[in-house]
């Protein structure tokens, strides 16, 4: 049996995938731009 690897934490979620984390890097800003262009209702976690 393999262990359950997903241990949810909202703090870790926000820090790695949140809006401010995205805005902090050039690549992250490109991610947001792509999601805006696609018309996503939610841009980030």
Swiss-Prot record:
Coiled coil: none annotated. This is Large ribosomal subunit protein bL34. It comes from the Bacteria. Pfam families: Ribosomal_L34. Belongs to the bacterial ribosomal protein bL34 family. GO terms for molecular function: structural constituent of ribosome. Keywords: Ribonucleoprotein, Ribosomal protein. GO terms for biological process: translation. It comes from Shewanella oneidensis (strain ATCC 700550 / JCM 31522 / CIP 106686 / LMG 19005 / NCIMB 14063 / MR-1). NCBIfam families: rpmH_bact. The gene is rpmH. The lineage of its organism: Bacteria, Pseudomonadati, Pseudomonadota, Gammaproteobacteria, Alteromonadales.
């Amino acid at each position: 049996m393999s262990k359950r690897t997903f241990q949810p934490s909202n703090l870790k979620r926000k820090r790695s995938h949140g809006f401010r984390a995205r805005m902090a890097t050039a690549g992250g800003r490109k991610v947001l731009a792509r999601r805006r262009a696609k018309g996503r209702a939610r841009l980030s976690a």
